[in-house]
Amino acid sequence: MTTALKETVGRYGIWSVGLRSEDPDRRGELAEAAAELEELGYGAVWLGGNSSAANAAPLIEATSKLTVGTSIQSIWQHEPDAAGPAFADLESAHPGRFLLGLGVSHAKRVEQYARPYSALVAHLDGLDAAGVPADRRLLAALGPKSLRLARDRAAGSIPYLVTPEHTAHAREILGEAPLLAPELGVIPETDPSRARALAREFLGIYLPLPNYTNNFLRHGFTEDDLSDGGSDRLVDALFAWGDETAIRAKIDAFFKAGADHLALQVLDGEHRDALPRKAWRDLAAVLLG
């Protein structure tokens, strides 16, 4: 099943907070954008924020083959008993089109946050009982324990804010079969100062979160790299920026490290709810043309 999943999602997808909007006035805009992404050749859309099957359904209905996944659905805010029927409804209407991406979120964002690994295991037990099959769920796994869980109890991992070096480490733990689909921020800016400023603006909400900073420290970065918005070394490792050649080189580094698929998040300085459709087209011309 995992081989088929890799073929279904292809090499490239789009990661977007904007595409999960619940604003009824934007439904037409979102449907049109999803249809265009499918036409451009992207294999998947990954819905950022605390997303759910309800967010995925309109995009699936607006397209014919695009895979839509949550990235992520917080285990603290969605009960397995509810996720099961939601998955079953989508699967019945659109077989094979929805992937349930799960994560433990962060202590600063969840009041009841405690023993996240044990809570994730219990959540997976609940999904088993609710009929959500392991081969249709993915984990936003960063550390070794959660990566092993993604290998053993899911179809793979959808890590966020990682480097090619983390990707190689993740592949070693996962083995060959599971899907490894990291998110990668893409900054279409050739001026180094401007590109890094955009990256640091984006990183501002993540550097206070231990899940990410601990992962950076595990993979060779220092406390100095995490200060003042992130060092050039950290920024350049985490983001693809520059001209087409530079962006393609960073993307290739992830694939060489063992990624099967990349969830590309365009960062252009606009609000995260915006839909950077021109940038998506430009990326498609480089990667899929």
Q: Residue locations for each model-derived region?
A:
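Active-site-adjacent structural elements that line small-molecule/cofactor binding pockets in enzymes
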Residues: 1-289
